[in-house]
Amino acid sequence: LLKELWTKIKGAGKAVLGKIKGLL
């Protein structure tokens, strides 16, 4: 359960970073 949650958090983090880089 913890690994699945961590994977989701990492995935969301990468998506957010991608959006930020796209805006800059």
Curated annotation (Swiss-Prot):
Expressed by the venom gland. GO terms for biological process: defense response to bacterium; innate immune response. The keyword Hydrolase does not apply. The keyword Cell membrane does not apply. The modification Leucine amide is found at L24. Disulfide bonds: none annotated. Its main location: secreted. Keywords: Amidation, Antibiotic, Antimicrobial, Secreted. It holds the Pfam family Antimicrobial_9. One of its GO terms (cellular component) is extracellular region. It is found in: Secreted. Has a broad spectrum of activity against both Gram-positive and Gram-negative bacteria. Is inactive against yeast, erythrocytes, and insects. Belongs to the ponericin-L family. This is M-poneritoxin-Ng2b. It comes from Neoponera goeldii.
